[in-house]
Structure formats: structure tokens, C-alpha cells
């Protein structure tokens, strides 16, 4: 009887050691076509108090990314979590002029406002992007192409 208990305990111990040596990876789940994270053209309505709203072409990051929770391969009493979100990988800045008819001063009838658009989109760990990741469009090579050409500033 004790020999069977010993063999069972030894089997469980060696199985646990074997599991801990092999890293366990999450199963890749393919999203249906068209649902992956991608940069999508949108119309952005810029608003400022006292000014007329202005519609401009822009981009947004839209789509789904894989997230999961599973038992840890190295610590079977713990769970591993991975959360990915469809986010921008860098940003572009633009300055747009809005017409403000209610301004008392003639000089303030046209107000410059800044806006941002993603440079590209990708699945990244959920959280906010660092301000240092913003790349001026001249560096990114977008200064002379695309629907945003007239909206983005040409020099700093």
C-alpha cells in the first residue's frame, strides 16, 4: 500500500517538474478578417468654444487584439495574464485653423488648434503611450502625401 502511495507521489512530483521545465504558450487565436487592429480613416470634428466646428479627415486605431489568462508554466499555482489593446504606435500632430465669428477682437476670429492622429496601429500592452513616442510627420515621411497633407504643419 505504501509503495503505491510512494509511486503516485513520485509520479506527481516528476510530472510537475516536467511541466515547470517546459514553457507553456498561449494558443494563437486568429481573428476573423477585417477585425484585426488597423488604422482606419475617420472624419474628426474639431470643436473649440466660440468657434464653428470643422470636419477634417483623420485616422483612428480600430480592431481587436488577443488577450488571455492561463495557468503559469513555471508556477502552476499562479495565473499569467496578457492584455493587448489596439493602439497607436506613434502619433502625428496637426494644426488646424477654426473660424470664431463671436470673437470680439478681429485677430482672434481665426484660432489655431492642435490635433493628433496615429502614425500606425498595432496590438500593444494596454496602457497609455509615452509623449516621447510622438514623431513629427517630417521625420516619419508623411509630409508630402496622404489626405492629411494640408492639415499637418510643414515646419516647427
From Swiss-Prot:
Q: Which residues form the CTCK domain?
A: 37-127
UniProt entry tagged with the keyword Transmembrane helix: no
> Per UniProt, what is one Pfam family of this protein?
DAN
Q: Where does this one sit in the cell?
A: Secreted
Q: What InterPro entries is this protein classified in?
A: Cys_knot_C, Cystine-knot_cytokine, DAN
- Tell me the PROSITE patterns matching this sequence: CTCK_2
Where is this chain primarily localised?
Answer: secreted
**Disulfide cysteine pairs (residue numbers):** 37-86, 51-100, 61-121, 65-123, 83-126
Which Gene Ontology terms cover its molecular function? Answer: BMP binding; hormone activity
One annotated GO biological process: animal organ morphogenesis
Source domain of life is Eukaryota
What range does the record give for the signal peptide? 1-26
Q: Which UniProt keywords apply?
A: Disulfide bond, Hormone, Secreted, Signal
Function of the molecule = Final heterodimeric neurohormone released at the end of the molting cycle, involved in the sclerotization (tanning) of the insect cuticle, melanization and wing spreading.
* Binding partners and assembly: Heterodimer of burs and pburs.
This protein's name:
Bursicon
Q: State the organism named in the record.
A: Manduca sexta
Tell me the organism's taxonomic lineage.
Eukaryota, Metazoa, Ecdysozoa, Arthropoda, Hexapoda
Amino acid at each position: 500500500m505504501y509503495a503505491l502511495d510512494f509511486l503516485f507521489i513520485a509520479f506527481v512530483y516528476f510530472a510537475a517538474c516536467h511541466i515547470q521545465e517546459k514553457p507553456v504558450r498561449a494558443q494563437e487565436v486568429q481573428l476573423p478578417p477585417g477585425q484585426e487592429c488597423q488604422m482606419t480613416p475617420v472624419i474628426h470634428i474639431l470643436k473649440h468654444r466660440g468657434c464653428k466646428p470643422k470636419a477634417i479627415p483623420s485616422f483612428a486605431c480600430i480592431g481587436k487584439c488577443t488577450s488571455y489568462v492561463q495557468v503559469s508554466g513555471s508556477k502552476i499555482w499562479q495565473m499569467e495574464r496578457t492584455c493587448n489593446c489596439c493602439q497607436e504606435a506613434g502619433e502625428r500632430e496637426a494644426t488646424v485653423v477654426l473660424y470664431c465669428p463671436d470673437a470680439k477682437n478681429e485677430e482672434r476670429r481665426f484660432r489655431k488648434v492642435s490635433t493628433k492622429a496615429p502614425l500606425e496601429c498595432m496590438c500593444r500592452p494596454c496602457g497609455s503611450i509615452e509623449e516621447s513616442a510622438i514623431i513629427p510627420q517630417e521625420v516619419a515621411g508623411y509630409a508630402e502625401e496622404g489626405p492629411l497633407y494640408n492639415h499637418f504643419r510643414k515646419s516647427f
